[in-house]
């Protein structure tokens, strides 16, 4: 059964996903500029979903339930939002955090919203010979099983880092748009099938 992304149970568009597998988006990291100076102590005291420990980290950590995300809010007005599962959810969450800051009396705007990183994952459902892959794709691969069980594959085009595990599970990170995630997976899929482990 091919994995299907956010489309629910619609069939996979094979013109876009020839492998029949659509990587699932797991985490979106976005940034926005609230474009005003913030008093982090005041925010932490007034907002019930916020924590601030300046000795540990120079930002307020705020969480909301819907979309389930975490924001890092800096005194400069810069904000990082993590944890959303889609670009739209990430933007919606960032807007919600901006509104919370506005309600606390700050003149927060919503400038330069940008998706910085998309993390996706999928499962090719067959085991992979990582040693062989690392050997034949040495220029792009680093594989040191004593340090980390996955092979790290740095694709040049699109510029995506893939973590490839012997089990056939794949993590893709570094995309700014979801199509880069999809393209990177379609690029690597024939390589993975080439290094498929024959099960005895």
From Swiss-Prot:
Sequence repeats lie at residues 25-101, 115-192. Keywords: DNA-binding, Nucleus, Repeat, Transcription. The keyword GTP-binding does not apply. InterPro entries: TBP, TBP_CS, TBP_dom_sf, TBP_eukaryotic. GO terms for molecular function: DNA binding; RNA polymerase II general transcription initiation factor activity. It holds the Pfam family TBP. One of its GO terms (cellular component) is nucleus. The keyword Acyltransferase does not apply. It is found in: Nucleus. Its main location: nucleus. Belongs to the TFIID complex together with the TBP-associated factors (TAFs). Binds DNA as monomer. This is TATA-box-binding protein. It comes from Nicotiana tabacum (Common tobacco).
